């Protein structure tokens, strides 16, 4: 593979910015008020989630990144801008919509176990004014980027009309648009370069229950043809990542003890986009993404993988595993 350590592609991310809050503690008793655990909080940390985690992953890989999204005029929005500034990301293209709620997901981790999550959010679609500002920003700056990533968490930023406008404009400027999809209406992503649904999402979108290689092939072709994609991809969790252009192949995942899958989809999207921007072919890009995801799931919380971590991880793998390129779907 091409050495990516000195690569810095310019990538534009558009989507739902989320705040991820982690409360860490321990638990050694049951509440007298109800049959629930009492967690003694020892520390907390707040990180970028959703499209923000895609941005964070790209920065960790060495990309130059900008983000387009919509925030409100609340304290969470101020916090979000601060987190982006902390990693050197420009907030010039964040549209402020009055009374817009920035989603915040709070997780309690007790003795290294994820106990509960509670959310503060709104899934209401952004207004027409915000959509028009995003289109204006996008059309003004798209020529400066190598690639576009759309991170849809179903929180109202990527409306159907806006998403189609972005994809069509990206094509007009000869820029690949990669999408991490959400929901059942995949026609909003029609014409994208590729989508990154997991097996469950792909089954729902294609209306094909995936349970073997035959049904996987049917579903992945259906997605490519129906939604006019350049490539069709389905992530298969422990079974790897399936790709279809003119033929099906499955790149296996690499063995690692899984601590937390939070944000693994963000890592797949970010690392695929990064590798493709650095002139990787799709198979090499998927292999790179599998390695990046392997690093991330070995950590707790919305995490990232650096180029050096990925190189070290690949080096640590058993030789027979690292040389196995493709395995059949199981």
Where are these regions (language model features)?
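Substrate-binding N-lobe of the ribokinase-like
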Residues: 2-4, 10-11, 32, 36-103, ...
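Non-cysteine beta-strand/loop elements that form the S-adenosyl-L-methionine
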Residues: 109, 192-200
